[in-house]
Amino acid sequence: MKIDIHAKNVELNDSLRQLINNKVSKLNTFHNQIINTDVYLRNEGESLHSNEIQIKLSVRNQTLVAKETNESFEKALDLAVNSMKRQLKKIKEK
């Protein structure tokens, strides 16, 4: 699975990049036909929930999207990955 990370108004350090790669690559265990994944990080200001992560995942002929905001990118990533797991399980059951 190919993972592309895009950051807007965010300084993407190596530890955050590694965390994203580790967590998102584990989604392969829930569906083995994931083609590619785009992860978008965005910081929209100084508010409490201004850190946003969006995961866009291509599976066969479908595109799945999970979008979460939180005070930290790590928490937003956990929420988005959990949301994506649910979507992948639902598709696999069909």
Descriptions of predicted regions:
Residues 1-94:
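N-terminal, polar/charged subdomain of small-to-medium soluble alpha/beta proteins
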